[in-house]
Amino acid sequence: MPTLTPPAGSEVIPFASVHTERVEDCLVFPSELSTKVRLGGLVTAVSGGILGAALLSQTSSQGVAVPALLMGLSFVGGLLSTWSPCGYSSLCLLRPVGPYSARSLVKYTPTFLLHGIGYAVGALILGCVLGIAGGLLGFGGVSFGALAGLGAAGIIYGAHQLGFLRVPYPQRRAQVPHDARQRFPVWFIGGLYGLSLGLNYLTYVQTPILYLVTAAAVLSSNIGAAILLFAAFNAGRFLPMAVNYLPVSDITVQNWLARRQEGAALLDGVLLVAGGAALLTFAAL
């Protein structure tokens, strides 16, 4: 047993070792996808985007097909943003307090609802600002130039996500304020985090689909359309919080996300390329 060295003439004091709980190092990491897999995703996305747009053009007008495509892309982009640092943080920090029970879930519900309201307010603010900005800049909604520009951006950023290109992706590299938990009740934190994340540009968002949604909102020059686009994106960001109503531990959720980080990036790239190819096809038709 180790001892503490005493001053001269003093009694030797035994020092018993103390076992402390610790978090084990992560031993399982997502493997990097091969070039063959990423290239296959790129080719499949281009083919699927072109074919999908051609089929849609036979059954519906561009005025219906293009908004539907952008809304779907926005929603899935919101889901994929769960793999951003703040997505991990929110799922971890905004959990029911205490053992899993009906009582803890009831007490958690105001936090969950206020988190969703925060996202809704964020979509409302962003949609109004970007829709008005588009009108002031003179954009006129769906046009050849708008479709071609959005399509090219989708393919370029999709190739970026797939690792074939490196293009600028400026983001504010910040997270929600973790210390707020020490100063405010958890229901207030739920609303605060929802608003911070719902504004999308206050914190880091991993998916470039956010850029496509922003550009589409501005180009629409329509406040209602811009709000709907960000409502879809923010709904995708918010819905994963519902996992906290299930009897699963925080570490289980975090590990599930971590093991699928590369897969999420692959899906992100494939969707961007497919969406871009579809928009370019609509522009050409």
UniProtKB/Swiss-Prot annotation:
Which parts of the chain span the membrane according to its record?
Answer: 39-59, 63-83, 120-140, 144-164, 184-204, 209-229, 265-285
Keywords, in A-Z order: Cell membrane, Membrane, Transmembrane, Transmembrane helix
| Domain of life per record | Bacteria
Annotated GO CC locations: plasma membrane
The pathway noted for it is: One-carbon metabolism; methylamine degradation
Q: How does it sit in the membrane?
A: Multi-pass membrane protein
- The name under which this protein is listed is Methylamine utilization protein MauF
Q: Which gene encodes it?
A: mauF
